[in-house]
Amino acid sequence: MRVKGGTVTRARRKRIMKLAKGYRGSKHRLFKTAKDQVMKSYAYAFRDRKVNKRKFRELWIARINAAARMNDISYSKLMHGLKVANIDINRKMLADLAVNDADAFKALVDEAKKALN
């Protein structure tokens, strides 16, 4: 007698089809294409978790640079000045200060300038 898989196969296919919900065209209708797309989606997710970190660092640096130049100093000089002044603050916090608390950022810039002179 031939075994058809029954509940196990249905459960496996249902799981894949549930993951493929919202995909376009046959990618959410047909099991084979849905399975391929779900696998591809996992690959994209894995890759983009790494890319995400790079993109945010880029964004923080752009924000810090813009705010620094408003205070007459370049990004690289600001970062070097902070290092010389032993001010250990990461780019995420620095960018947040630049956007939300301009006075505190200016105080840090002044400390960096003082350390460079």
Curated annotation (Swiss-Prot):
Taxonomy, superkingdom: Bacteria
GO CC list: ribonucleoprotein complex; ribosome
Gene3D superfamilies assigned: 6.10.160.10, Ribosomal protein L20
GO molecular function: rRNA binding; structural constituent of ribosome
Keyword Protein transport attached: no
GO biological process: ribosomal large subunit assembly; translation
Keywords: Ribonucleoprotein, Ribosomal protein, RNA-binding, rRNA-binding
Functional summary from the UniProt entry: Binds directly to 23S ribosomal RNA and is necessary for the in vitro assembly process of the 50S ribosomal subunit. It is not involved in the protein synthesizing functions of that subunit.
Family designation: Belongs to the bacterial ribosomal protein bL20 family.
UniProt-recorded name of the protein: Large ribosomal subunit protein bL20
Gene: rplT
